Swiss-Prot record:
Localization terms from the record: Microsome; Endoplasmic reticulum
GO cellular component: endoplasmic reticulum; intracellular membrane-bounded organelle
Key words of the record: Endoplasmic reticulum, Microsome
Protein name, per record: 13.2 kDa protein
Domain of life, per lineage: Eukaryota
Species name: Scyliorhinus canicula
Keyword field contains Ion transport: no
Length: 14
């Protein structure tokens, strides 16, 4: 799970 701007907008692996 990778959070870019603290949001769940840019999550990889999910």
């Amino acid at each position: 799970m990778i959070f870019t701007a603290x949001d769940r907008s840019a999550i990889e692996x999910v």
